Design a protein with these regions (language model features):
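Bacterial N-terminal signal peptides
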Residues: 16-26
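Extracellular/lumenal glycan-associated surfaces
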Residues: 50, 189-194
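Acidic, glycine/proline-rich low-complexity segments that act as flexible tails and inter-domain linkers
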Residues: 4, 28-42, 53-70, 76, ...
């Protein structure tokens, strides 16, 4: 009788052990899987960009502190604020930099040392800025071939030149931020201002063409709703539906 009971007893103890083992394996897989939403650094970039764009300097100040605490370097945050001037103008970009300077001074006075971070590498003197910028713009648009100017770019050729040679070359070629980060900052700024649906759609598509996932885009929209405004988030969701339908 003892020999008859042993297999049954083994099964009795093995089954709970197997259940526990499967549970532990599922936890390990969850821990090793990449996060689907925006990480802390990305969330900080979104908030800094949004508050700089809409001029909410009171909320910008804690957002800058959050960005530093999330691990962004001084130079990365400077780059975010400088990058934005091409979309929101010098005045608001300069306001953002002024607030950031004050935040750093206050932190230094309290004995907090923030990481300076990498500075931008010099651009090669031989860089063909027109060709480089045209290629960057085509990449953001998801186009293999560079298209000739049309519409407003053909109507005012000089702005096409400025876009290619300055925005998409002088600015985008700076290696402090990658293209995905730049596009994330751009859509945060554009989504925080009214009447920019067309530009937001282009750059939201550009962000996805630079590697922003649908889950990260959803996280961006949720953050916009929670920390910037439901009206801005609702308008951005309308644009996002169009972008997701084509990606």
């Amino acid at each position: 009788m003892i020999f008859l009971k042993e297999p049954a007893m083994r099964r009795q103890y093995l089954l709970p052990l197997l259940v526990i083992l499967m549970f532990l394996l599922s936890l390990l897989q969850a821990d090793n899987s990449p996060a689907k939403g925006l990480d802390g650094r990305q969330q900080s970039m979104v908030l800094v960009s949004a508050y700089t764009a809409n001029g909410d300097l009171e909320r910008l100040r804690p957002a800058l502190i959050q960005a530093l605490d999330a691990g962004l370097s001084i130079n990365e945050i400077k780059e975010v604020l400088t990058h934005l001037y091409a979309y929101i103008g010098f005045p608001r970009s300069l306001n953002g930099l002024q607030v950031f300077m004050e935040v750093l001074e206050q932190r230094r006075a309290r004995g907090i040392t923030d990481t300076e971070g990498k500075a931008a590498s010099p651009l090669p003197p031989s860089l063909d800025r027109d060709a480089y910028g045209a290629r960057v713009r085509a990449d953001l648009a998801g186009q293999k071939e560079i298209q000739p100017p049309s519409g407003v770019l053909a109507f005012a050729p000089v702005i096409d030149t400025f876009l290619k040679e300055h925005l998409f070359a002088d600015i985008f070629a700076r290696d402090v931020l990658d293209r995905k980060a730049r596009e994330l900052c751009t859509i945060a700024a554009l989504a925080s201002l009214p009447g920019l649906g067309g530009q937001l759609q282009f750059h939201m598509g550009g962000a996805m063409n630079c590697g922003l996932s649908p889950e990260e885009l959803e996280s961006f929209l949720d953050l916009l709703a929670a920390r910037v405004g439901t009206q801005e988030a609702d308008a951005a969701r309308t644009v996002a539906r169009k972008v997701l339908a084509s990606h």
